[in-house]
């Protein structure tokens, strides 16, 4: 039945009932008749219902999610609204808070007043009276401080402050803001660099004191009184304000104008310095300051300004109170005194001490600075200041407090010690007042006032950068050494200039010259100042230890001591490290850098102190000018050190002083360098040499730094030096001579003193080896170029520096660039006797790098210029003996490229040298000026065979120019090689300024160009090595001549040394004459060598053709240069012996040209053999260095004798002759023994020489090879051959020199040259 009913029901569904979902009704109907169909239908129903439920749930979920999203969005909007309200409320809160404070206070006041109005209208008036009085007093103070009352009586007529009518009647003129607000220091000035406030902070502090008296005290009183009056109308505000106003009214009412009288007086005293107290003091201060400070108007202005700011109410109240102590000179009050007027006595410190009773703590830091500073300088100043105006000077103030309390002994020491040095008391007076004051505020003034005081300034600035800690102790030792310096009164005359300078500078020199301690007992004492601390300990240990300890102290010690030793010993190290820099280039650089870092870390003072120590070096260089060799070495070291410092300061100080210190230390130190150069450069070279010396300095620094860096290369170099030593079996003696010579370079005077050699024999023997190694490093292409620039730079620089020292003594260049420059100039001036050596030597040396040879050549020239410049070739040969075929050729190729440029440098240097050596320059420029231009055209591109003919006329002329223009040019021969690079832009015959400018820019550009040339030299080494094998075959027959030709290259590199040696020792000149003249007469090799020397004058076409065939254009050019250099050398050797080196150089060029003119070209043949010789040249170059150094020692000893007479010519002649003697013999032996190697080296050399840019270097190398054959002839031929040509071959030079330049054409196209052979 159920089934039936379902079935009956199913048909209407047209489908089985069990297959479709049943409805609820169906389920209910069939509930009684349940069947399987009902189960199926129920299942279907349930499934459908489940699906619907699920779908429904999903829909609800979606809706819920949408709701959540809406809710979140609403939440965000709500929060945004909250944030808006918060922002609004905060803004309104801030605004309301401001308004609320004002409104509430006013409301409270109004309420209180209203509550009390009935009671206290009278009280209110009484309460208002103090306020009104304060307001009036403040207003009057403002009028007094800010305005000058033209109508004083009208203002003073009213006894009551409240009367404003007559005040209105007052004619008020606003005061000059810059009375109270002085202008900042000159930008870039020492003070500007040293002081963070650049002179404004002190005055702001003074104004702060002034303003603090006016403003801070007045404002604080106003605030206090207003607060008190607001809080307690009748209580303190009435009492205090009434008392305050009573004081003011006593001043104002009693005077009726004390407000105005004070205004008048203060207006007047602002001008005068204060009211009665100030007017009294300022007159005495102004008188004392005018008497003592003399030059320090700005200090007085600052004092007056500070005082002007202070004649205010506090001036009246507190300063009147302070006035008695100020007058009394009480140590109790000196800081307040400083605030009032004691800063004005120390007007320069005025900022530091100036208004700063308030800022005594700051001043005390400065007091300690200046206590330490003033203790050296200000102790006498405090004596003088305390004696004439004890209260005011002691306010140096805090100085009296600290000096009297803690530093009376310092004061006494320095009073006695510094007054003991004649200059020191003179220095302390200005320096004590101003030199130390404001660190260097008065250094501007001090330079004029205290350039001799540079000792004090050195102390003070050294102490300044050693400011507080190191200074007190350092200065305490410093006064003791000064005492011992004053004990060494013999040296105190010099030491007075160098007393403190030796302290800061002589540590350098002491480290350089321990025997110079004996030379300069002051330096020992001053050294003891520093050696007491670190310096003499490290100095006693050794220069190396001194450099390491000094470097250690530079690094280990405080910046202060490090600066003393970092700047001074760092420079010592630099000077001694020029040899040592090879051992410790990085320590010296690190000391320099740390000195530079200290310069930055220890403030600008360190910088200045480094500059001071540089200046000290210059000063001691001059004070030690008797040891003018070391003086020049020091000068060059000073420049080298300064330059190194410049460069390391460029590295380190490039931050603050890359502009400031670079512009200052460079500009200033460079100014020192430059001003030494600029001052003398302006006179001797104009400023262009000064400009050149900056670049020169930079290059020196760079080259020296490379030398320092070349220590890295030294590792290579020692191995090469080993080979050099192997080759230099004889050369080791020469190397020892080199070492001694480099020692002499660094301590020319030391070696003259014989003890300095011990300085360097202790460390410089190692240094000598490393100096030789460094020379070898200099031989590296990098250093070759840089060293050539450096030697060029040093030639021009040392020449400029010496000429500058000679002419720069008047310190014509910017005093403000560096007071120390001024000081260094004055100190150099002060050391005029030595400077006379420098003067003669400088100018002469400018002409005749005697100093350049001894120093420029010994140190900068021998090590860098000759030893390095030539070592650039020779040392590279020594260092690169193994690599030398490449290195020498690289060198020679860069030198060839540089050669033309360096010949221009020779020219440029020749103008410098021409001052002393004008005859050569004068003789040759006529033929040379055109030739110089042709020489300029002789750039490596111009050196092509086609251009070679022009170039031969030009290049010999250039070599002649470089050398004859200053046969010191021969001494500059080594110098000239770098000088050619340096002087590329300026013709030798051109004016010195052009040289300086040319050298300046040329050095900069050439450093870069050389950097380019070095790879060229390397590439040229390979090319030249290939082609040199061809030319080697050519040159094998010419081996001795080629050695001679190569030797002249060494003369190019080393001739300066030979000449300085000859200059130093005419004996060596005679020796050089003996080998030089006999070689002319002696064996064919000698004649060939002499001919190679004389190639410039009469190159034998056959041999010259051989030169061309051999590709020895460079040998020819260089050989002719070297030959002519040797010829001129030989000529000048008798000339030097006769004292008419120029005349005899003219004579010998004629003789040499006549006798060996034919041989000149034969020598040109040997120059093709130069290709063989370069390795012998390497050996011989080492020998040259050894001989050079040994001869430099001779030259150093004899250079003093010959410096004055013929520093230029003698040095050139002697350098060549002297070098010609020893290296000539040794290198003849070596050439004989090493000619096969020479040929091998010639191959490599010409591989180097193949590069056109390095043609001249190649010539130099070949000249060195000639030097191997005949050392005398080598140098003469390398440097003098062309010089002789311009002399004898002025007419012949064009044709014959062109034939020489046919050889040059080979060098012009090194590849073609070899191919053209």
From Swiss-Prot:
Residue numbers carrying Phosphoserine: 157, 159, 204-205, 209, 284, 385, 387, 521, 526, 601-602, 710, 763, 778, 853, 1029, 1047, 1064, 1092, 1152, 1155-1156, 1316
Family, as annotated: Belongs to the FAM21 family.
Function comment: Acts as a component of the WASH core complex that functions as a nucleation-promoting factor (NPF) at the surface of endosomes, where it recruits and activates the Arp2/3 complex to induce actin polymerization, playing a key role in the fission of tubules that serve as transport intermediates during endosome sorting. Mediates the recruitment of the WASH core complex to endosome membranes via binding to phospholipids and VPS35 of the retromer CSC.
Subcellular localization, as worded in the UniProt entry: Early endosome membrane; Cell membrane
Motif range (LFa 10): 832-838
Sequence ranges of Low complexity compositional bias: 201-213, 379-399, 529-548, 569-582
Chain intervals for the UniProt region annotation (Required for interaction with F-actin-capping protein subunit alpha (CAPZA1 or CAPZA2 or CAPZA3)): 1004-1022
Biased composition (Basic and acidic residues): 289-325, 366-376, 583-592, 613-627, 717-744, 788-810, 874-906
Keyword Protein transport appears in the UniProt entry: yes
Gene that this sequence comes from: Washc2
Ranges for region Sufficient for interaction with WASHC3, WASHC4 and WASHC5: 1-219
Organism encoding this protein: Cricetulus griseus
GO cellular component: cytosol; early endosome; early endosome membrane; plasma membrane; WASH complex
Self-association state and partner proteins as the record states: Component of the WASH core complex also described as WASH regulatory complex SHRC composed of WASHC1, WASHC2, WASHC3, WASHC4 and WASHC5; in the complex interacts (via N-terminus) directly with WASHC1. The WASH core complex associates via WASHC2 with the F-actin-capping protein dimer (formed by CAPZA1, CAPZA2 or CAPZA3 and CAPZB) in a transient or substoichiometric manner which was initially described as WASH complex. Interacts with VPS35; mediates the association with the retromer CSC complex. Interacts with FKBP15.
Motif (LFa 13): 1147-1161
Motif (LFa 18): 1306-1314
Protein name stated in the entry: WASH complex subunit 2
């Amino acid at each position: 039945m159920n089934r039936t009913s379902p079935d009956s029901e199913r048909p209407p569904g047209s489908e089985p009932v069990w297959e479709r979902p049943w409805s609820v009704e169906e389920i209910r109907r069939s509930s009684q008749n349940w069947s399987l169909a009902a189960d199926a239908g129920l299942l279907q129903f349930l499934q459908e219902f489940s699906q619907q439920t699920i779908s429904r749930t999903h829909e609800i979920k979606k809706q819920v999610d949408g709701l959540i999203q809406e809710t979140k969005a609403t939440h965000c909007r709500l929060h945004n609204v909250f944030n808006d309200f918060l922002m609004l409320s905060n803004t309104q809160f801030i605004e309301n808070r401001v308004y609320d404070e004002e409104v509430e206070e006013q409301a409270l006041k109004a309420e209180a007043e209203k509550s009390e109005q009935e009671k206290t209208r009278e009280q209110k008036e009484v309460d208002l009276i103090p306020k009104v009085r304060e307001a009036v007093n403040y207003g009057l103070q403002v009028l007094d401080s800010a305005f000058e009352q033209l109508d004083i009586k009208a203002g003073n007529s009213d006894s009551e402050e409240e009367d404003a009518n007559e005040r209105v009647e007052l004619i008020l003129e606003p005061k000059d803001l810059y009375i109270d607000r002085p202008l900042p220091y000159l930008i870039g000035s020492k003070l500007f660099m040293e002081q963070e406030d650049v002179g404004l902070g002190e005055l702001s502090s003074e104004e702060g004191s002034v303003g603090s008296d006016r403003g801070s005290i007045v404002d604080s009183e106003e605030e206090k009184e207003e607060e008190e009056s607001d809080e307690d109308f009748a209580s303190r505000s009435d009492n205090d304000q009434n008392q305050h106003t009573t004081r003011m009214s006593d001043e104002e009412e009693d005077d009726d104008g004390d407000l105005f009288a004070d205004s008048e007086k203060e207006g007047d005293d602002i001008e005068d310095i204060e009211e009665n107290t100030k007017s009294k003091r300022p007159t005495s201060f102004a008188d004392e300051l005018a008497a003592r400070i003399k030059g320090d108007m700005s200090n007085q202005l600052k004092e007056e300004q500070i005082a002007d700011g202070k004649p205010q109410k506090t001036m009246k109240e507190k300063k009147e109170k302070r006035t008695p102590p100020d007058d009394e000179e009480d140590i109790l009050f000196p800081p307040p005194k400083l605030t009032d007027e004691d800063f004005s006595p120390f007007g320069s410190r005025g900022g530091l001490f100036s208004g700063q009773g308030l800022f005594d703590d700051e001043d005390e830091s400065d007091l300690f600075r200046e206590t330490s500073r003033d203790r050296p300088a200000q102790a006498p100043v405090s004596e003088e200041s305390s004696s004439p105006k004890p209260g005011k000077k002691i306010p140096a103030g805090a100085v009296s407090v600290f000096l009297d309390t803690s530093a009376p002994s310092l004061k006494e020491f320095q009073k006695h010690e510094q007054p003991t040095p004649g200059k020191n008391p003179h220095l302390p007076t200005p320096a004590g007042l101003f030199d130390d004051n404001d660190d260097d505020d008065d250094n501007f003034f001090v330079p004029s006032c205290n350039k001799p005081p540079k000792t004090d300034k050195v102390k003070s600035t050294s102490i300044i950068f050693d400011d507080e800690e190191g200074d007190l102790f350092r200065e305490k030792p410093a006064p003791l050494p000064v005492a011992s310096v004053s004990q060494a009164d013999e040296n105190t005359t010099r030491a007075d200039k160098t007393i403190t300078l030796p302290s800061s500078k002589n540590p350098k020199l002491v480290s350089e010259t321990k025997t110079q301690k004996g030379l300069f007992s002051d330096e020992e004492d001053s050294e003891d100042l520093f050696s007491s601390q670190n310096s003499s300990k490290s100095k006693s240990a050794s220069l190396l230890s001194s450099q390491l300890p000094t470097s250690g102290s530079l690094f280990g010690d405080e910046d202060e001591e490090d600066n003393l030793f970092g700047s001074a010993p760092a420079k010592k190290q630099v000077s001694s490290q020029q040899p040592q820099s090879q051992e410790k280039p990085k320590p010296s650089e690190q000391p320099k850098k740390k000195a530079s870092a200290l310069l930055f870390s220890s403030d600008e003072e360190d910088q200045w102190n480094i500059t001071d120590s540089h200046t000290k070096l210059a000063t001691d260089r001059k004070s030690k000018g008797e040891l003018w060799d070391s003086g020049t070495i020091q000068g060059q070291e000073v420049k080298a050190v300064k330059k190194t410092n410049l460069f390391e300061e460029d590295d380190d100080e490039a931050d603050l002083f890359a502009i400031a210190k670079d512009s200052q230390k460079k500009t200033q130190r460079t100014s020192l360098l430059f001003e030494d150069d600029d001052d003398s450069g302006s006179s001797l070279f104009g400023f262009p040499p000064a400009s050149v010396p900056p670049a020169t300095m930079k290059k020196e620094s760079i080259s020296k730094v490379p030398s320092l860096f070349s220590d890295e290369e030294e590792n290579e170099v020692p191995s090469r030096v080993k080979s050099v030593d192997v080759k230099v079996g004889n050369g080791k003696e020469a190397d020892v001579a080199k070492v001694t010579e480099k020692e002499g370079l660094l301590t020319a005077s030391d070696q003259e003193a014989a003890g300095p050699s011990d300085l360097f024999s202790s460390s410089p023997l190692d240094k000598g080896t490393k100096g030789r190694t460094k020379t070898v490093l200099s031989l590296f292409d990098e250093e070759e170029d840089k060293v050539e620039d450096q030697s060029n730079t040093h030639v021009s620089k040392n020449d400029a520096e010496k000429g500058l020292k000679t002419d720069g003594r008047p310190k014509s260049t910017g005093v403000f660039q560096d007071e120390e420059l001024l000081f260094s100039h004055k100190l150099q001036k002060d050391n005029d006797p030595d400077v006379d050596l420098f003067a003669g030597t400088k100018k002469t040396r400018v002409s005749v790098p005697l100093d350049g040879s001894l120093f420029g050549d010994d140190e900068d020239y021998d090590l860098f210029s000759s030893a390095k410049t030539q070592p650039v070739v020779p040392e590279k040969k020594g260092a690169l003996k193994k690599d030398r075929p490449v290195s020498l050729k690289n060198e020679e190729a860069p030198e060839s490229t540089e050669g033309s440029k360096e010949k221009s440098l020779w020219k440029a240097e020749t103008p410098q040298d021409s001052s002393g050596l004008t005859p050569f320059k004068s003789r040759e420029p006529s033929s040379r000026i055109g030739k110089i231009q042709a020489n300029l055209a002789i750039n490596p591109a111009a050196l092509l065979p086609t251009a070679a003919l022009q170039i031969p006329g030009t290049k010999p002329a250039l070599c002649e120019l470089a050398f004859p223009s200053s046969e010191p040019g021969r001494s500059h021969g080594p110098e000239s090689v770098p000088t050619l690079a340096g002087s590329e832009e300026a013709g030798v015959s051109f004016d010195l300024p052009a040289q300086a400018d040319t050298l300046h820019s040329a050095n900069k550009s050439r450093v870069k160009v050389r950097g380019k040339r070095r790879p060229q030299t390397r590439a040229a080494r390979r090319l030249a090595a290939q082609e040199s094998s061809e030319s080697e075959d050519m040159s094998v027959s010419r081996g001795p001549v080629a050695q001679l030709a190569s030797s002249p290259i060494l003369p190019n590199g080393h001739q300066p040394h030979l000449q300085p040696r000859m200059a130093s020792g005419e004996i060596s000149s005679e020796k050089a004459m003996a080998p030089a003249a006999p070689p002319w007469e002696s064996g064919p090799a000698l004649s060939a060598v002499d001919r190679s020397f004389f190639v410039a004058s009469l190159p034998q076409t056959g041999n010259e053709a051989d030169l061309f065939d051999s590709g020895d254009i460079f040998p020819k050019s260089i050989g002719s240069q070297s030959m002519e250099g040797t010829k001129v050398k030989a000529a000048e050797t008798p000339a030097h012996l006769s004292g008419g080196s120029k005349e005899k150089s003219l004579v010998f060029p004629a003789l040499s040209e006549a006798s060996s003119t034919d041989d000149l070209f034969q020598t040109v043949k040997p120059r093709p053999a130069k290709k063989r010789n370069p390795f012998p040249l390497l050996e011989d170059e080492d020998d040259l260095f050894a001989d050079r150094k040994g001869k430099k020692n001779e030259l150093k000893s004899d250079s003093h004798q010959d410096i004055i007479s013929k520093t230029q010519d003698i040095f050139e002649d002697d350098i060549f002759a002297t070098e010609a003697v020893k290296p000539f013999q040794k290198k003849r032996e070596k050439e004989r023994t090493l000619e096969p190697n020479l040929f091998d080296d010639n191959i490599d050399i010409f591989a180097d020489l193949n590069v056109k840019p390095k043609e001249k270097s190649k010539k130099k190398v070949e000249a060195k090879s000639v030097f191997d054959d005949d050392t005398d002839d080598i140098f003469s031929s390398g440097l003098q051959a062309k010089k002789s040509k311009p002399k004898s071959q002025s007419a012949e030079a064009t044709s014959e020199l062109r034939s020489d330049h046919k050889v040059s054409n080979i060098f012009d196209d090194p590849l073609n040259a070899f191919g053209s052979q």
